[in-house]
Amino acid sequence: AGKSVWGSGFLPSVYQGVQCRSDGEPVLFINNPDDISSDERKASIAALSDINKLHYDEFKDPDILTRISQYELAFKMQTTVPEVMDIASESEYIHNMYGSNPHKSCFANNALLARKLVERGVRFVQLFDWGWDTHGTSESGSIDIGLVNKCRQTDKAVTALILDLKQRGLLEETLVVWGGEFGRTPMQENREGKTNSF
């Protein structure tokens, strides 16, 4: 996966995604540069937008429209991202339900963040969970321990996400798709894992 999955595919580039990181700054470069006030930033984005619109009128390049919308989105995100990304303010009940922990990186935090994004009107949210490569080279990669733990963590978080969406009346207008792409053969390897299916 990685940055390649955040593109817009065959759609105009204005539809590409914004990657939220689980460690460090959630969205890179969201804050104003040092010594630049919010008003100065807003004025510079407005000036850039005007220049880009003139450029678009002349060249009709759809990537220019993308650039305009990205600058505008980035400015709007400066005020909303810090609050939305703050899962520490959620109740103890919610953290217990999801299995989330604001002080460490985990899939449950991302599931809780997904609910917060849906609440804010984000139209498409995609979660990834890594570490499913159960070849049995370690305890965390074994079928009887590692795979069971991974399933337990994701099952709890996804169940909580669906229940939380339902309790808040958001599930009626939210399509939840759960899928995977990493298949294994039914044959056991000579270690505690299974081989790739391709």
Residue map of PLM features:
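Ligand-binding pockets and gating/stacking loops
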Residues: 1-198
